[in-house]
């Protein structure tokens, strides 16, 4: 309970800082744009589409999520009026089948209160990359209507700083920040490339981390009041984005944090986010004591729902008690048929919308304070379709499900998982603010058709699309599609409490940062380690940076530990590094870490922990993993 309280206070401090910096305290209830981009309407509005989809025949019909006809008429030129429709997903069809003969429409319940600043319902939009300037306002409006609190964008360092210290004029990254912040959305930005002048291998971190410091300082200044949070790198732990070790990720994190805070002390400096659930990389980052240098611990996952408890437990263990942000997650579906459309089957569209609600519910239950579903725009990788919108901004059913989660799980905090003898039932209770009213909200589904008894009838019940559902008495009829049951606050249910947050680790950032620079070819990525050749002296370049305003003098120590298959009488390897060092303000000082006596005789791996005590400048830590190899 104590750790839960501390985590809640940390989260509240972050939200308060966001509101103060971005003017989010003035967030209002959004209204649709007059043009109704994406054919998204609110209940009570007359649904009108500008034109019918292409197709044969002289009639059309509109059907709901279940395929039931709700309107029909004869083909004519000009706008087509469907009348006032209840919450739901609809398609206008010109023929019995064929995605090219369909046009989708979404009807949402309008928000009854502004979306809370602490609501966990967020989404990855990547607006700067996916939408031209003229569509950005429309996309931001759709996010706001869906009750989204925070959005994730993308930036390109090479575009923003094509030459060192020469920044681009106003461009798509500024436009996207302006459009989203103007809609009341809290913007998170992320980078994943170095410009060629900082590293010829663009997928790797800059060689000189002062370049990262300067870039993030200037971006935090440039977008103050518009971009409230930054991830310094995307998925640095996989080869696509550089294949970095946990140690390298920690060094970048420390420098980026210092730069961001120098540019805007109120900005949220997120951890450069993990792609993989790899224990070695997680441990490596943690050993480098990076926790004073991130405000939130960020991760991604695309694993099956039954893997969530173990996955979150492992990340939570190295989170240092910081708020968990999941900035990409989903259990996606495949597309089939016409490769120009890349559209899932009708059945998979239903599955996508059902999984979206479950993704939010389970991630929040595991302790995530911000959950960014991946992804709003139409986006495919291979045969996988991730997007909840189509290229023309019209919705897939999952967008309507997104709006239901945004409204009904607004400000959701987990209370626990319902204990029930039926193992097919999944039911998670939250304290939330559905429609602006504090209540307990139960999200429940089942792998088989069954029923769940409640202590008393719910105040209201909605399906995963946000459509009102009648409940007879105290019984919820469940199937694979989640239900949202709104209960009175304090409703007593038999609960398994949510996982406790990790213990909050204490520490202060140091202005001194250390970095090892090794070629990518020397990395053993699955072990988050570098290769050390047996029988040879291995030299590792170590760089010390001073981001303070005064010279720093400190003492370095290099204790080693070994993972061995047999007892070691004496340390088989030796590490040599100058014991005393001075670093001027702004300096990047190179030292040589020399390893001698490297052998494979019983040693499977070694760790070197360089600790620098720099007095008022603070304590610097660099931990490196090594594996011996034989040429």
Task: Show the residue positions of the predicted features.
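C-terminal beta-strand-rich structural cap/linker in extracellular carbohydrate-active enzymes
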Residues: 472-515
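Active-site cleft segment of glycoside hydrolase catalytic domains centered on the general acid/base Glu
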Residues: 163-164, 171, 198-294, 301-317, ...
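Short, surface-exposed loop/turn segments at beta-strand-coil junctions that are enriched for proline
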Residues: 82-85, 596-602
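Terminal connector regions
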Residues: 98-101, 495-513, 598-631
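Carbohydrate-binding surface patches
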Residues: 36, 64-65, 419-457, 552
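Short acidic, flexible loop segments centered on an aromatic residue
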Residues: 61-63, 454-458, 549-570
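N-terminal substrate-binding region of glycoside hydrolase catalytic domains
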Residues: 79, 108-214, 218, 231
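Aromatic/acidic polysaccharide-binding cleft in carbohydrate-active enzymes
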Residues: 340-403, 417-423
């Amino acid at each position: 309970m104590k750790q839960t309280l501390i985590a809640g206070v940390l989260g509240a401090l972050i939200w308060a800082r966001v509101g103060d910096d971005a003017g989010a305290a003035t967030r209002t209830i959004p209204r649709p744009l007059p043009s109704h981009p994406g054919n998204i309407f609110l209940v009570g509005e007359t649904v009108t589409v500008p034109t019918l989809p292409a197709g044969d025949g002289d009639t059309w019909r509109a059907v709901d999520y279940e395929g039931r006809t709700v309107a029909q008429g004869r083909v004519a030129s000009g706008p087509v009026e469907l009348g006032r429709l209840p919450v739901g997903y609809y398609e206008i069809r010109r023929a019995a089948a064929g995605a090219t003969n369909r046009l989708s429409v979404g009807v949402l319940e309008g928000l009854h209160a502004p979306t809370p600043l602490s609501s966990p319902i967020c989404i990855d939009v990547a607006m700067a990359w996916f939408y031209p300037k003229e569509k950005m306002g429309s996309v931001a409006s759709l996010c706001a209507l869906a009750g989204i609190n925070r959005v994730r964008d993308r930036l390109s360092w090479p575009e923003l700083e094509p030459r060192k210290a020469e920044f681009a004029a106003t461009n798509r990254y500024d436009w996207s920040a302006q459009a989203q912040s103007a809609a009341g959305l809290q913007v998170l930005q992320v980078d994943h490339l170095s410009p060629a002048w900082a590293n010829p291998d663009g997928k790797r971190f800059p060689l000189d981390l002062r370049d990262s410091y300067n870039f993030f300082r200037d971006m935090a200044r440039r977008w103050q009041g518009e971009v409230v949070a930054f991830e310094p790198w995307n998925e640095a732990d996989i080869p696509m984005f550089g294949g970095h070790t946990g140690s390298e990720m920690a060094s970048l994190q420390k420098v980026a944090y210092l730069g961001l805070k120098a540019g805007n002390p109120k900005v949220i400096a997120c951890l450069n986010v993990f792609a993989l659930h790899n224990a070695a990389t997680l441990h490596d980052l943690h050993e480098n004591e990076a926790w004073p240098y991130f405000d939130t611990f960020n991760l991604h996952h695309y694993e099956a729902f039954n893997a969530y408890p173990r996955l979150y437990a492992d990340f939570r263990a190295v989170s240092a008690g910081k708020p968990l942000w999941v900035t990409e997650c989903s259990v996606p579906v495949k597309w089939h048929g016409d490769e120009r459309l890349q559209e899932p089957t009708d059945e998979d569209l239903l599955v996508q919308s059902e999984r979206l609600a479950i993704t939010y519910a389970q991630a929040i239950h595991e302790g995530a304070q911000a959950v960014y579903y991946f992804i709003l725009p139409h986006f495919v990788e291979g045969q996988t379709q991730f997007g909840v919108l189509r290229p023309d901004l019209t919705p897939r059913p999952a967008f309507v499900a997104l709006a239901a989660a945004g409204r009904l799980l607004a400000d959701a905090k987990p209370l626990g998982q319902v204990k029930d003898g039926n193992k097919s039932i999944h039911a998670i209770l939250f304290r939330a603010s559905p429609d602006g009213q504090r209540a307990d909200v139960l999200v429940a589904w089942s792998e088989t058709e069954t029923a769940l008894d409640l202590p008393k009838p719910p105040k209201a019940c909605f399906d995963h699309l946000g459509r009102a559902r009648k409940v007879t008495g105290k019984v919820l009829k469940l199937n694979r599609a989640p239900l949202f049951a709104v209960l009175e606050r304090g409703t007593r249910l038999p609960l398994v409490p949510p996982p406790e947050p990790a213990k909050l680790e204490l520490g202060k950032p140091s202005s001194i940062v250390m970095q090892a620079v090794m070629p990518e070819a020397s990395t053993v990525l699955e072990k988050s380690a570098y290769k050390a050749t047996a029988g040879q002296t291995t030299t590792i370049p170590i760089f010390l940076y001073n981001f303070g305003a005064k010279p720093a003098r400190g003492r370095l120590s290099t204790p080693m530990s070994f993972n061995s298959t047999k007892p070691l009488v004496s340390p088989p390897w030796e590490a040599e590094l100058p014991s005393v060092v001075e670093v001027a303000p702004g300096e990047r000082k190179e030292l040589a870490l020399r390893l001698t006596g490297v052998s494979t005789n019983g040693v499977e791996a070694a760790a070197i922990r360089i600790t620098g005590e720099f007095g008022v400048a603070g304590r610097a830590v660099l931990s490196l993993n090594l594996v011996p190899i034989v040429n």
